[in-house]
Amino acid sequence: MRFGLNIDHIVTLREVRKTYEPEILEALFIAKNTHKVDLITIHLREDKRHIQNEDVLRLLEISPLPINIECSINAEITDFLCSLKNKPSKVTIVPENRNEVTTEGGLDCSLKGLEEVIRAYHNKGIEVSLFVDPLKDALHFAKEHQVKQVEFHTGVYANLHNALYSNANNQIHAISTLKDKCPKELKEELHNAFLQLRRMSKEAFFMGIVVCAGHGLNYSNVKELLKIPSLRELNIGHSVVSKAVLVGLEKAILEMAQLIKR
């Protein structure tokens, strides 16, 4: 299993104060020196709430690890990434809403302009992945447009797992639609969400599409996904950075790697 470390929220801390620390490159090399991280993931958002264009340039110039850049189909961002001298290892196209706290679901593959953006990256020799819900239509769209990777949105699975097996429902930011559900109902929905991820991962495998996954994964809910044999990569960020605040980044990375690289 490949471990993609998302370092967006290290930069979030920097941007809160508009200062120079924490240093994104220091985080990069801490990750590299653990010898457990396979790639670095960053999300270049339209609103630039964390990662900035300059961060992209600096990372691509010196990173010893592959860089996966998440982004929308925004024309300005597409032009910027296509113009880069140092190319990312892949671009993962994600849905984006300026009012969202975090990505809320998978990409709508009928989105106007999506096909043109995929072609633009392919023409520059940049591999494309699509951040999608685990659905057949998304896989067929990827296959039709020569997209060799998808990343399944695991938010539904993760939220259900957290509601059932952690104290998430008692926290200040509990998800209202899950808070009042009984354990039996949560368990059934969680089982179905996992089965859907497993079924669609198998479907993708037989279609020749590499399957990655991410969103909302943490030290508790990630273990079940290791039972999906066709899953090749997990991208995890917020939970690792959250733990790093308390125990340090190196230890937080190693603890996650111990779970997913067994």
Curated annotation (Swiss-Prot):
It catalyses: 3-amino-2-oxopropyl phosphate + 1-deoxy-D-xylulose 5-phosphate = pyridoxine 5'-phosphate + phosphate + 2 H2O + H(+). It is an enzyme of class 2 (transferase). The record marks E151 as: Transition state stabilizer. InterPro entries: Aldolase_TIM, PyrdxlP_synth_PdxJ, Pyridoxine-5'_phos_synth. Its EC number is 2.6.99.2. GO terms for biological process: pyridoxine biosynthetic process. One of its GO terms (cellular component) is cytosol. The active site is at H43, E70, H215. 3-amino-2-oxopropyl phosphate binds at N6, R17, G216, G237, H238. It comes from the Bacteria. Pathway: Cofactor biosynthesis; pyridoxine 5'-phosphate biosynthesis; pyridoxine 5'-phosphate from D-erythrose 4-phosphate: step 5/5. Catalyzes the complicated ring closure reaction between the two acyclic compounds 1-deoxy-D-xylulose-5-phosphate (DXP) and 3-amino-2-oxopropyl phosphate (1-amino-acetone-3-phosphate or AAP) to form pyridoxine 5'-phosphate (PNP) and inorganic phosphate. Belongs to the PNP synthase family. Homooctamer; tetramer of dimers. This is Pyridoxine 5'-phosphate synthase. It comes from Helicobacter pylori (strain J99 / ATCC 700824) (Campylobacter pylori J99). The lineage of its organism: Bacteria, Pseudomonadati, Campylobacterota, Epsilonproteobacteria, Campylobacterales. The gene is pdxJ.
